[in-house]
UniProtKB/Swiss-Prot annotation:
Name of the protein in question: Turripeptide OL11-like
The keyword Glycosyltransferase appears for this protein: no
Site (Reactive bond): M7, E8
GO function terms (MF aspect): ion channel regulator activity; serine-type endopeptidase inhibitor activity; toxin activity
Cystine connections: C1-C31, C5-C24, C13-C45
Organism listed in the record: Lophiotoma albina (Sea snail)
């Protein structure tokens, strides 16, 4: 999981109920935690 994410703030709501600063951060977290986290919708949860 060598993903480098920008600090751009385009929040997305993950299927784990958490708001991520952008889709890259969600994808990176899913990879490092070995969980299947998907984007439920754009914006905060």
């Amino acid at each position: 999981c060598m993903t480098i994410c920008t600090m751009e703030y385009w929040p997305v709501c993950g299927s784990d109920g958490k708001t991520y600063p952008n889709k890259c951060h969600l994808t990176s977290t899913a990879c490092t935690s070995q969980k299947d986290i998907t984007v439920l919708h754009e914006g905060k949860c």
